[in-house]
Structures are given as structure tokens and as C-alpha cells.
A protein has these predicted regions:
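Conserved PLP-anchoring active-site segment centered on the Schiff-base-forming lysine
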Residues: 53-74, 85
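A short helix-loop-beta submotif of the ANL/AMP-binding
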Residues: 78-82
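Short glycine-rich anion-binding loops that position phosphate/pyrophosphate groups of nucleotides
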Residues: 43-44, 68, 112-116
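Glycine/Thr-rich phosphate-binding loops of Rossmann-like dinucleotide-binding domains
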Residues: 47-50, 71-72, 117-118
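Active-site phosphate-binding strand-loop segment of PLP-dependent enzymes
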Residues: 88-128
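Short acidic capping loops at alpha-helix termini that bridge into adjacent secondary structure
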Residues: 33-37, 57-60, 104
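N-terminal small-domain helix-loop-helix segment of the aminotransferase-like
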Residues: 1-45, 49
């Protein structure tokens, strides 16, 4: 019973909503300022934050066919134009994606490995 009592102490407290300790630890580990780190409730939340910061209703967002389902949802949620590039063998066609970029393109989403197809792109090809 003592172990249970000890384990339950503090369970009624809410976690730090700003992630102060986590941001400090990440900043220390990756040698960046804590203010450069944004935390979110999973990738969906972070992708929406990124879209809202960098794009708007006049923007285009490029992503591959068969890419992560959240990309078109996030694009639609901010009223941006979705530019879906046809996939090749269920994977990203990086050359076609690059050609799809216009002056209105604010984001290019590339999942690697891709979800849901599990195809991947080697790092060297991503650094264009």
C-alpha cells in the first residue's frame, strides 16, 4: 500500500503546459535556444501550426499523391491551394514536386518514410 500511496502523490497535478523543462532539455541537447522549439500534441498539431505560420489562403502547398492524410486536411483548413503531385511507384516524385513549386508555394510536405505507403527517399536526394 505504501508503494501505491507514493506512486499516486502528485498525480492530481497538471503537467507544465509550456513544456519548460522539456524545451530546456532539448535546447541543451541540440544546442539551440529554448525559444526556437515548438511543442505540439502530435504531428497533426505541429503540421497545422507550421501551415498557419508559413501559409495562408493565397498560398499553395505541395505534397505527393498517397502522402500523409493530414497534408490535404491542413491545407484545406487554412484555405490554401493543395498541389498534389502524382506518385511514382507509390513514392514521391521529387523532380515533379520541384517543378510544381511556384511563387505562391509556401510549403512542400515530404514524409520520409512516407505514410501510408512506407516508401522512402535517401537523404542525398532530399537535399536539393
Amino acid at each position: 500500500m505504501k508503494a501505491i500511496e507514493t506512486a499516486f502523490q502528485g498525480l492530481c497535478r497538471y503537467p507544465d503546459g509550456g513544456g519548460f523543462k522539456l524545451k530546456a532539455a532539448l535546447a541543451d541537447r541540440y544546442n539551440v535556444e529554448a525559444g526556437q522549439i515548438t511543442l505540439g500534441n502530435g504531428s497533426n498539431d505541429l503540421l497545422e501550426i507550421v501551415a498557419r505560420v508559413f501559409a495562408d489562403s493565397t498560398s499553395e502547398i505541395v505534397f505527393s499523391q498517397y502522402a500523409f492524410a493530414v497534408y490535404p486536411i491542413v491545407t484545406q483548413s487554412i484555405g490554401a491551394k493543395a498541389v498534389e503531385v502524382p506518385a511514382v511507384n507509390w513514392g514521391h516524385d521529387l523532380q515533379a514536386m520541384e517543378k510544381a513549386i511556384t511563387d505562391n508555394t509556401k510549403l512542400v510536405f515530404i514524409a520520409n518514410p512516407n505514410n501510408p505507403t512506407s516508401t522512402d527517399v535517401v537523404k542525398k536526394k532530399l537535399l536539393f
